[in-house]
From Swiss-Prot:
It comes from Saguinus labiatus (Red-chested mustached tamarin). This is Tripartite motif-containing protein 5. Residues 186-199 are annotated as: Required for interaction with GABARAP and for autophagy. The lineage of its organism: Eukaryota, Metazoa, Chordata, Craniata, Vertebrata. GO terms for cellular component: nucleus; P-body. The B box-type zinc finger domain and the coiled-coil domain contribute to the higher and low order multimerization respectively which is essential for restriction activity. The coiled coil domain is important for higher order multimerization by promoting the initial dimerization. It holds the Pfam family zf-RING_UBOX.
Length: 494
C-alpha cells in the first residue's frame, strides 16, 4: 500500500516535459507545474517569434510574469528522494505492492508483471503466465521496433512542422508583395480610386488574417503532435534503458498507444483557389485618366456672358447659370433664350473647361458658333442643336436620357405617283455606367474635334465630334434648360 502511495506522489511531482522529478518547479495559472529549465526551453522552441506563451499541456495562455516558484512541490520532491534512497524502500524495489513478494511472473492477458500470490488470486486465475526472463527479449524487440518507428515519425512530424512554418513565411511574403503591387497601381489614380483601393486592401487584409490564423493553428497542432511523440519516445527509451521490470510494466498498453498513433498532416492552402486581385478595368481607367490629365493641361478660364432677353440668370462672378422664368407682356413679341455663351471666343488652339451639373434633370452644353435668328424661339427643339446650325453639344433630358445631337439624316418616302424627302434629326443615345456630375469639354480647333469627358467616372470619354467645320469663331455654350438647379463652371483647383 505504501509503495502505491509513493508511486502516486511521484507522478504528482514529475515534470510532464522531461518526465523526471521536478527541479526548481514553477507553476502556471492553470495549475500545471514544470521544471524551470524545461518550461523555459519549451517556450523558446515552440514560440520563437511570438511574445505569447501557453501551457504545453492545456495550451492556456499566460504572461511570463505569472510563472511562480512552487516551494511546496520542491519540498515534496526532496522528501520523496530521501524516502526512495532509504534502505527500507530499496528492499521493496521489484516486489509486489499488494503482497510484498518478488515480481517473477508476467501475465500475458493483463500485460503486467506479478508475483506468485497474484497468479493464484481470483484476478489472474486461468491466465497464461511466464517467467519474466522468458518474455523480456520478445518485448524488448517489439519496443525497439516501435522506437525506430516513432523516431521516423518524429522526423516526419518535424519536417511537416518546418513546412508549415515555411508556408506561413511564404504567405506573408506573397501577401506583402500583393499589397505593394496593389498600392503601386492605385498610386497613379490616388484621388479617384481611394475608395476602390481601400476596399481591395480590406479584402486582402481579411484574407491574410484568415489564412495566417489557420496556419498558426495548424502549426500549434503540429507542435502538440511532436511533443506527444517525444513523450512516447522518452517513455520507450526509459523502458529500454531501465530494468526488465520497468521494460515489461504496462508494456501492452504502451504498444497499443503506439499502434494507434497516426501522423496528422497540416492543412494547406492552394494558390489556385485563393482570391486573386482584379482591378476594375484598371488599364482602361489608367488610359482614361491619362487622356483626361493630358487635356486638362489646356484648362481655359471661361466666364459666362449675359444675353438679353433670357430665361438664364448668371451669378455675379459669371461662373454659374440657372433657369428663371421672366414675365413679359403678351402683346410684345420677344424671343427668349434658354442658354448663354461663354467667353472668350475661340479661333485657334486647344481649350478645356469643366462644368458641374450635379442633380440637374435637364441641361445642354458644348460649343456653338453664335446664336442664330432661327434658333432663338424654338431652341428647345432638338433639330436646332445640329452641327449644321453651329452647335456641337450633348445634353440630358428627363433625368437620365443622355444624348448627343448630330446633323439630320435625310430619307425618301415613295408614294404612288410622287416622292417626298424629309429630314430627321439624329439624336445619339449615350449610355454611361456612372452618370456624370461633372463634365469636361475639350476643343481642338485645328484638329476640328470637340470631346466630352465624364470626370465623375475617372475621365472616361462620353462623346467626340470629329471633322467639325469651324468657319467662324466659336464660344462655349451652356443651357440650364427648364431645370432651376444651376450649372457651374469649375476651377482647376476644385
Amino acid at each position: 500500500m505504501a509503495s502505491g502511495i509513493l508511486v502516486n506522489i511521484k507522478e504528482e511531482v514529475t515534470c510532464p516535459i522531461c518526465l523526471e522529478l521536478l527541479t526548481e518547479p514553477l507553476s502556471l495559472d492553470c495549475g500545471h507545474s514544470f521544471c524551470q529549465a524545461c518550461i523555459t526551453a519549451n517556450h523558446k522552441e515552440s514560440t520563437p517569434h511570438q511574445g505569447e506563451r501557453s501551457c504545453p499541456l492545456c495550451r492556456m495562455s499566460y504572461p511570463s510574469e505569472n510563472l511562480r516558484p512552487n516551494r511546496h512541490l520542491a519540498n515534496i520532491v526532496e522528501r520523496l528522494k530521501e524516502v526512495m534512497l532509504s534502505p527500507e524502500e530499496g528492499q521493496k524495489v521489484g516486489h509486489c505492492a499488494r503482497h510484498g513478494e518478488k515480481l517473477l511472473l508476467f501475465c500475458e492477458q493483463d500485460g503486467n508483471v506479478i508475483c506468485w500470490l497474484c497468479e493464484r488470486s481470483q484476478e489472474h486465475r486461468g491466465h497464461h503466465t511466464l517467467l519474466v526472463e522468458e518474455v523480456a527479449e520478445k518485448y524488448q524487440e517489439k519496443l525497439q521496433v516501435a522506437l525506430e518507428m516513432m523516431r521516423q515519425k518524429q522526423q516526419d512530424a518535424e519536417k511537416l512542422e518546418a513546412d508549415v512554418r515555411e508556408e506561413q513565411a511564404s504567405w506573408k511574403i506573397q501577401i506583402r508583395n500583393d499589397k505593394t503591387n496593389i498600392m503601386a497601381e492605385f498610386k497613379q489614380l490616388r484621388d479617384i480610386l481611394d475608395c476602390e483601393e481601400s476596399k481591395e486592401l480590406q479584402n486582402l487584409e481579411k484574407e491574410e488574417k484568415n489564412i495566417l490564423k489557420r496556419l498558426v493553428q495548424s502549426e500549434s497542432d503540429m507542435v502538440l503532435q511532436t511533443q506527444s511523440m517525444r513523450v512516447l519516445i522518452s517513455d520507450l527509451e526509459r523502458r529500454l534503458q531501465g530494468s526488465v521490470l520497468e521494460l515489461l510494466q504496462g508494456v501492452d498498453d504502451v504498444i497499443k498507444r503506439i499502434e494507434t498513433v497516426t501522423l496528422q498532416k497540416p492543412k494547406t492552402f492552394l494558390n489556385e483557389k485563393r482570391r486573386v486581385f482584379r482591378a476594375p478595368d484598371l488599364k482602361a481607367m489608367l488610359q482614361a485618366f491619362k487622356e483626361l490629365t493630358e487635356v486638362q493641361r489646356y484648362w481655359a478660364h471661361v466666364t459666362l456672358v449675359p444675353s438679353h432677353p433670357s430665361y438664364a440668370v448668371i451669378s455675379e462672378d459669371e461662373r454659374q447659370v440657372r433657369y428663371q422664368f421672366q414675365i413679359h407682356q403678351p402683346s410684345v413679341k420677344v424671343n427668349y433664350f434658354y442658354g448663354v455663351l461663354g467667353s472668350p471666343s475661340i479661333t485657334s488652339g486647344k481649350h478645356y473647361w469643366e462644368v458641374d451639373v450635379t442633380n440637374k434633370r435637364d441641361w445642354i452644353l458644348g460649343i456653338c458658333v453664335s446664336f442664330k435668328c432661327n434658333a432663338k424661339w424654338n431652341v428647345l427643339r432638338p433639330e436646332n442643336y445640329q452641327p449644321k446650325n453651329g452647335y456641337w453639344v450633348i445634353g440630358l433630358q428627363n433625368t437620365n436620357n443622355y444624348s448627343a445631337f448630330q446633323d439630320a439624316v435625310k430619307y425618301s418616302d415613295f408614294q404612288i405617283g410622287s416622292r417626298s424627302t424629309a429630314s430627321v434629326p439624329l439624336i445619339v443615345p449615350l449610355f454611361m455606367t456612372i452618370y456624370p456630375n461633372r463634365v469636361g469639354v475639350f476643343l481642338d480647333y485645328e484638329a476640328c474635334t470637340v470631346s466630352f469627358f465624364n470626370v465623375t467616372n475617372n475621365g472616361f470619354l462620353i462623346y467626340k465630334f470629329s471633322n467639325c467645320h469651324f468657319s467662324y469663331p466659336v464660344f462655349p455654350y451652356f443651357s440650364p434648360m427648364t431645370c432651376e438647379l444651376p450649372m457651374t463652371l469649375c476651377s482647376p483647383s476644385s
